[in-house]
């Protein structure tokens, strides 16, 4: 299992060599025998059989090598046709090879000989390994894990204070500060996750951990793995009697998380190889050395292939090794080994394959104990069975320890385990041998029905909702048996007593194998880890080359624009004012290179989840990660900055001196490196993209404002002068300005000058820049210091900070009451009982899956009537254009047919399962019938109760429950349902009836206790997967549809959750609706809850359409009637059997076509007749007709969308609270930096300073708004696609709601900013001027926000929108009128000033404050005249400017609406 739990093929244990002590002493125990010895003398066994003389000589030569060389050399057959390379096919002459340098071909050939088919050969191979180790008396290290009196608690907010509204986020932060100071008592409640549990996990035994969601399984596994840091923890966990402090638990045991965090740009093989390289080989090398020494002494010749395998897998420092290949094979990942893992942006492997990569990542290491959390999610039952079987072989043969949590283990998988731990609400209800578990529950009065999987029974029997159906003591009345009662009864049960007795005797530490527990912190040397990270970083730079190429092109483009704006023929050196324009060009260059570093933020943050996972698993220390990310990206700066400087230096007309050119290039390189380091640090410290964007912009803004150009040094107030001295941009601006203005072309004294200073020095002094030449090197040195500082801070942040946490844990009062009632057996109040007792039939009669049914008569019709409708379809064909990849492989057809003439019918009150293997076309057929396809070619007839289907009307009477459970994250369950009902129920349904109907639906789907729970984002916060599934169903049900399609409603759920969802589905059918579900791999009782089956085979053809029958009898009878089909065995799942006997390989083996057999059957004729019958409209019926496309008017749609957006925004503090907080802080900082500068108008520099305050605020707060709105709109757009397809509303009301909700938040933001800044900077206090200032700020922030929304609307994803919009921000910045005024802009670019929205904002702000002031400045020119001459800003234009600003706002909002209406980036 070495190499990964699944392998540790030598489980020599994870004991590492530590410095000091000889090899011999390391493996000697106290009595003088070797650490791996089992007896004092090793047996001496001779080689058997005759050997080829040549090979015998080769082996003899190998044995004579020194130990170090001997463990690196193996004898392998030569590869035919490979020029003598070894490692190939089975036969041929054998040669001695160095195992450290085996190539992929040789490794593959060796594995083929050892484990050709994982299913058949793995056990044989492991037994060979074990036999080799055992025969020289070496013992495998084992670990026994004990946990005693384990208690874990968390602090949670209960009720409304836990809902993250803008107000709550502020009050909770204040409350936490007051708690910390001891001013206020905390309102949080303590929630116990684990309740005083004790037990033993034995080695060489497989332990299955079961329990419903929220029972504490993940917390328990984390506690066993020594990974609980953030929760209150008491009790102890020991390994072989040793406390956690005595060894390194993260490396001794491997915790495999249920979250699949991987770098999408790496292939599966690269991901596992990197993991293996970091984790090292544990004690495999040391054990191998001892093994070969003993074999040599005993003159034993091992199996050559096994010897080669063990040697190759004991070598450290290989970029890819044999263990990786072995794990890929046994996890069934060979087929996708060289495919990218993928993520949201990169297409990659499937969810099930990704789950296996997560498992394999830890199996390639040398850990001896494995704690695996839900490793089967997304896998089909046969793959899960195969993986668990391989793990079982490794654990049993090589002596590992494993606790594995599974969601819905099939009976055959369940039977692979030796022990069971059943956890419920933090109590251990049972722990011990699998054989005794049913005996315990029978003693408690509960019996598992015949056709019920034991694992499913165990997960349901402790639940209040499900327990009653299993009550077996019919002579006694049933009463609810609470969890506490089960737990205490288990203590008295014989298994519980034996565990208690064993725990009473402490583990004898002297029996612990010296190599069992790992004491070194990392698997390999620091230099090896650094090398591994360097190789990975180089790979990722290559794979992400698009980002760097795009960044370079973007910088070049801006450089090209800059050099044509500051064109040398227009750049003069006749006055200080000319110098200011040159300085503007230099400022713009420095700022663009700073902004170019901003792309490090998302690149850093997207990799952090994987980094934190690997750091916490002790793959490597943070510095081995941060150094490569700094050093290896430096060459990019040379190219990007080189392009910028080489293009622009001469064309702009900077000082024509080659030395000064290279000094400018050197300085810009330092700026580029400093910016990248700064933003990496911000990303590492913030760990969240929204927060990082805010603080990255914030730091950039502060550095820029205090950088010496926007506000001259002599104007910086004394309380902010420290900020000037620590701003990297100050040093950059000083150095680059000194380099230019002390050059020869500025070395002249003006005739009209009052001083003898050169023009260059005067220009420098006019902006408060130090005019001495030494300031170039001071600036350069300071930038190098900042580069070092930010990289060190980045390393420290990644070393000590925790991963970005989930939001504050909260729980509703109803959930808390229900939890306590389940534990203690308290009676629940009426509201909570309403949902707990809403039980209905799940299975067909006699299966034991019945549940007392108290609700049929009253719920049959429900409050709102509906018309039952049937759906028939005949000869449905669906094809798409042939993919280019397939054409490249020689396929000549123009179209690829996915459905081939499928026919069938779905009827009211009949629950139909749509099944088939992956690629059979289940979801495709459902999408075609529901009208959800956005492309492709559809042929055939679809009728609704005999009338041709029209999509506009069909959407009104149908519901579609998608597999992905897409909902707005910031609304509650009841609000989601109200929104759906409001927009989809007919106009004539009044609000009271609507509310009653919603209550009925919530009761039907058991959502009442969760009515006030926030939906949240999947896998991040809010509802669990199973609760989201039920919400998806409820959202469709409140539309009162007649026909409902459900795509995989039980995938990713545990057995109990799947039963709850199926009960919901069954309840829905019992109301008389037509329901069709695609289903993946159902358990027996879920499968038999269906009435009919529509079975498809790969290629899109039906092979069985008809009733299931009692205990699936009709289905079994049909397939067993086909000659050659193997009979089903007793108790076997009919669904699994049916899929197994209808595979393509079975068709080929039997030489039949199941589709042909079905089309020639009597069943097909019956179905044809039924389709004919249902395709004729019943007498007296009429075709579906609705006077309008949507059930509600345009106005109601707008109001409903606005209502939902209001709730979403109010409960989104990371977006709204942070932008309001940021705006307030920026306003206070600006107010203090530009304190009282608004009233100073003596010099032109005073006006530039005031304009600088406006420019910086507008640009940065505006860009912040534009950036931070994008992820919000992107999440809501995916919900919009689902809701529009469901016929809830048209695109414009959605766009209206999204646009309108921004008005109040932006107004508050503008008012906060304007009041603070206006008063502190000291602009003229007149009502008109203040309101003009507020007006321009408000509409500017609004158009920036709408521009960000528009960018999302026009692009397929948030990431692309972010890149596109940032390119335009750079161009806007150039043409604002601040860096270079409009009159100074070359005529060929002046047109852009008129279409740049920020230029109009600055026009409005300047002219409204200064355009009417006639007071003369020190040089006698009136202020308004200077403003008009220098900027070309006319006060008479103020009204027109205001209209233009409003027009830009409306334009961006309109374009957002247009994009949402016309563009659909969802492809189906």
Curated annotation (Swiss-Prot):
CDD domains: ABCG_PDR_domain1, ABCG_PDR_domain2. Residues 33-53 are annotated as: Disordered. The keyword Cell membrane does not apply. GO terms for molecular function: ABC-type transporter activity; ATP binding; ATP hydrolysis activity. One of its GO terms (cellular component) is membrane. The chain crosses the membrane at residues 546-566, 575-595, 634-654, 666-686, 690-710, 778-798, 1217-1237, 1247-1267, 1303-1323, 1330-1350, 1360-1380, 1387-1407, 1440-1460. Keywords: ATP-binding, Membrane, Nucleotide-binding, Repeat, Transmembrane, Transmembrane helix, Transport. It is a multi-pass membrane protein. ATP 2 binds at residues 916-923. Its main location: membrane. It comes from the Eukaryota. It is found in: Membrane. ATP 1 binds at residues 211-218. Residues 528-741, 1196-1410 form the ABC transmembrane type-2 domain. Residues 178-450, 871-1123 form the ABC transporter domain. Belongs to the ABC transporter superfamily. ABCG family. PDR (TC 3.A.1.205) subfamily. May be a general defense protein. This is ABC transporter G family member 34. It comes from Oryza sativa subsp. japonica.
């Amino acid at each position: 299992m070495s190499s990964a739990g699944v392998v540790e093929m030598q489980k020599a244990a994870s004991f590492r060599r530590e410095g000091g002590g000889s090899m011999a002493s390391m493996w000697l125990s106290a009595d003088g025998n070797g650490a791996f010895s089992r007896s004092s003398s090793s047996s001496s066994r001779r080689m058997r059989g005759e050997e080829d003389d040549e090979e015998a000589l080769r082996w003899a030569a190998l044995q004579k090598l020194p130990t170090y060389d001997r463990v690196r050399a193996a004898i392998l057959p030569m590869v035919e046709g490979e020029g003598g390379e070894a490692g190939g096919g089975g036969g041929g002459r054998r040669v001695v090879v160095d195992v450290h340098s085996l190539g992929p071909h040789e490794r593959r050939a060796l594995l083929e000989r050892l484990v050709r088919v994982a299913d058949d050969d793995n056990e044989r191979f492991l037994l060979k390994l074990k036999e080799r180790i055992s025969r020289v008396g070496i013992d495998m290290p084992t670990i026994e894990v004990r946990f005693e009196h384990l208690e874990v608690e968390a602090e949670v907010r209960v009720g409304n204070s836990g809902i993250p509204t803008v107000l709550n986020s502020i009050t909770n932060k204040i409350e936490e500060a007051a708690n910390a100071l001891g001013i206020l008592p905390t309102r949080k409640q303590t929630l116990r996750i684990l309740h005083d549990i004790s037990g033993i996990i034995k080695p060489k035994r497989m332990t299955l951990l079961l329990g419903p969601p929220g029972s504490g399984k993940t917390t328990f596994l984390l506690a066993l793995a020594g990974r609980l840091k953030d929760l209150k923890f008491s009790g102890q966990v020991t390994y072989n009697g040793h406390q956690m402090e005595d060894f390194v638990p993260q490396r001794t045991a491997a915790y495999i998380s249920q979250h699949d965090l991987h770098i999408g740009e790496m292939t599966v093989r690269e991901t596992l190889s990197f993991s293996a390289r970091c984790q090292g080989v544990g004690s495999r090398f040391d054990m191998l050395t001892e093994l070969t020494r003993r074999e040599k002494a005993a003159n034993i010749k091992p199996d050559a292939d096994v010897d080669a395998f063990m040697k190759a897998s004991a070598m450290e420092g290989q970029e890819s090794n044999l263990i990786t290949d072995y794990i890929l094979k046994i996890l069934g990942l060979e087929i996708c080994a060289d495919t990218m893992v993928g993520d949201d942006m990169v297409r990659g492997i499937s969810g099930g394959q990704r789950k296996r990569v997560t498992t394999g990542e830890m199996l390639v290491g040398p850990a001896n104990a494995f704690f695996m959390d839900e490793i089967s999610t997304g896998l089909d039952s046969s793959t899960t069975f195969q993986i668990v079987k391989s793990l079982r072989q490794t654990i049993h043969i090589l002596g590992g320890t494993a606790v594995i949590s599974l969601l819905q283990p099939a009976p055959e998988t369940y039977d692979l385990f030796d022990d069971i731990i059943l956890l419920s609400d933090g109590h251990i209800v049972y722990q011990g041998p699998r054989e005794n578990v049913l005996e315990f529950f029978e003693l408690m009065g509960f019996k598992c029905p015949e056709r019920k999987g034991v694992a499913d029974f165990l997960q349901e029997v402790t639940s209040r909702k499900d327990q009653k159906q299993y009550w077996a003591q019919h002579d006694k009345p049933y009463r609810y048996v609470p969890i506490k009662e089960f737990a205490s009864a288990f203590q008295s049960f014989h298994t519980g007593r034996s565990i208690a007795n064993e725990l009473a005797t402490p583990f004898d530490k002297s029996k612990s194998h010296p190599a069992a527990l790992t004491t070194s912190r990392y698997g390999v040397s620091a230099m090896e880890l650094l090398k591994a990270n360097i190789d990975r970083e180089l790979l990722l730079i290559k794979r992400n080359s698009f980002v760097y190429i795009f960044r370079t092109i973007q910088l070049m483009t801006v450089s090209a624009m800059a050099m044509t704006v500051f064109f040398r023929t227009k750049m003069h050196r006749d006055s200080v004012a000319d110098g200011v324009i040159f300085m503007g060009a230099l400022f713009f260059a420095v700022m663009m290179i700073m902004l170019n570093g901003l792309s490090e933020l998302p690149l850093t943050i997207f990799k952090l989840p994987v980094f934190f996972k690997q750091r916490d698993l002790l793959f490597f220390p943070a510095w081995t990660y941060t150094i490569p990310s700094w050093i290896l990206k430096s060459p990019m700066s040379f190219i990007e900055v080189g392009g910028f400087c080489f293009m622009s230096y001469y064309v702009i007309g900077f000082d024509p001196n080659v030395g000064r050119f290279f000094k400018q290039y050197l300085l810009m390189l330092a700026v580029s490196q400093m910016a990248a380091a700064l933003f990496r640090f911000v990303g590492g410290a913030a760990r969240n993209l929204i927060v990082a964007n805010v603080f990255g912009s914030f730091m950039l803004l502060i550095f820029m404002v205090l950088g010496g150009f926007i506000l001259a040094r002599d104007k910086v107030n004394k309380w902010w002068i420290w900020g000037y001295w620590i701003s990297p941009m100050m040093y950059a601006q000083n150095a680059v300005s000194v380099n230019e203005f002390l050059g020869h072309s500025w070395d002249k004294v003006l005739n009209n000058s009052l001083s003898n200073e050169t023009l260059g020095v005067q220009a420098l002094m006019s902006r408060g820049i130090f005019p001495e030449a030494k300031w170039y090197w001071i600036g350069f040195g300071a930038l190098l210091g900042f580069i070092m500082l930010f990289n060190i801070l980045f390393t420290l942040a990644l070393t000590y900070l925790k991963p970005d946490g989930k939001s504050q844990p909260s729980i509703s009062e109803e959930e808390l009451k229900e939890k306590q009632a389940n534990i203690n057996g308290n009676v629940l109040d009426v509201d909570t009982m309403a949902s707990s007792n809403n039980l209905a039939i799940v299975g067909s009669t006699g299966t034991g899956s019945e549940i007392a049914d108290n609700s049929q008569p009253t719920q049959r019709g429900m409050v709102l009537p509906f018309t039952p409708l049937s759906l028939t379809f005949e000869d449905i064909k669906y094809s798409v254009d042939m993919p280019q990849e397939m054409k490249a492989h020689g396929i000549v057809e123009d179209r690829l047919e996915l459905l081939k003439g499928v026919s069938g019918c779905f009827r009211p009150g009949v629950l139909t399962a749509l099944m088939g293997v992956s690629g059979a076309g289940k979801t495709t057929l459902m999408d075609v019938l529901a009208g959800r396809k956005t492309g492709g070619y559809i042929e055939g007839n679809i009728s609704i109760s005999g009338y041709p289907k029209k999509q506009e009307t069909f959407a009104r009477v149908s519901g579609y429950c998608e597999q992905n459970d897409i909902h707005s994250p910031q609304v509650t369950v009841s609000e989601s349902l109200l929104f759906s009902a409001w927009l989809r129920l007919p106009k004539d349904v009044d609000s009271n009836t609507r509310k009653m109907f919603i209550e009925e639906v919530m009761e039907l789907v058991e959502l009442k206790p969760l009515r006030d729970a926030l939906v949240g984002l999947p896998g991040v916060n809010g509802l669990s997967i199973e609760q989201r599934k039920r919400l998806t169903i409820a959202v469709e049900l409140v539309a009162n549809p007649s026909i409902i399609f459900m795509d995989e409603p039980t995938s990713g759920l545990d057995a109990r959750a799947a039963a709850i969802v199926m009960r919901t589905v069954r309840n829905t059918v019992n109301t008389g609706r037509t329901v069709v579900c695609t289903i993946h791999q159902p358990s027996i009782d879920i499968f038999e809850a269906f009435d009919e089956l529509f079975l498809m085979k790969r290629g899109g053809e039906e092979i069985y359409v008809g009733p299931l029958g009692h205990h699936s009898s009709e289905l079994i009878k049909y397939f067993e009637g086909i000659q050659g089909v193997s009979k089903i065995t007793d108790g076997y799942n009919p669904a699994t059997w049916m899929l197994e006997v209808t595979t393509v390989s079975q068709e080929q083996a039997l030489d039949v076509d199941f589709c042909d057999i079905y089309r020639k059957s009597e069943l097909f004729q019956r179905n044809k007749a039924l389709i004919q019958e249902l395709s004729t409209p019943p007498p007296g019926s009429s075709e579906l007709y609705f006077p309008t496309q949507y059930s509600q008017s345009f106005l109601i749609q707008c109001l409903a969308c606005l209502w939902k957006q209001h709730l979403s925004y109010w409960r989104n503090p990371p977006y709204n609270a942070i932008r309001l907080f940021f705006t307030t802080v920026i306003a206070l900082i600006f107010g203090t930096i530009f304190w009282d500068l608004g009233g100073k108008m003596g010099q032109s520099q005073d006006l530039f300073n005031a304009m600088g305050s406006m420019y910086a605020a507008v640009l940065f707060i505006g860009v912040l708004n534009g950036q931070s709105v994008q992820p919000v709109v992107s999440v809501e757009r995916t919900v919009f696609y689902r809701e529009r397809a469901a016929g809830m509303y048209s695109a414009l009301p959605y766009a209206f709601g999204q646009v309108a909700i921004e008005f109040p938040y932006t107004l508050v933001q503008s008012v906060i900013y304007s009041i603070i800044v206006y008063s502190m900077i000291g602009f003229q206090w007149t009502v008109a001027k203040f309101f003009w200032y507020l007006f321009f700020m408000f509409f500017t922030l609004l158009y920036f926000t709408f521009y960000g929304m528009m960018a999302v609307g026009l692009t397929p994803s948030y990431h692309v929108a972010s890149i596109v919009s940032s390119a335009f921000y750079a161009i806007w910045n150039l043409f604002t009128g601040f860096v270079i005024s409009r009159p100074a802009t070359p005529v060929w670019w002046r047109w852009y000033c008129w279409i740049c929205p920020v230029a109009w904002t600055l026009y409005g702000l300047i002219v409204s404050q200064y355009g009417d002031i006639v007071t003369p400045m020190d040089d006698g020119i009136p202020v308004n005249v200077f403003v008009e001459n220098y900027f070309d800003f006319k006060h008479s234009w103020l009204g027109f400017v205001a209209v233009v600003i409003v027009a830009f706002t409306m334009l961006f909002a309109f374009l957002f609406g247009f994009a949402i209406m016309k563009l659909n980036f969802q492809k189906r």
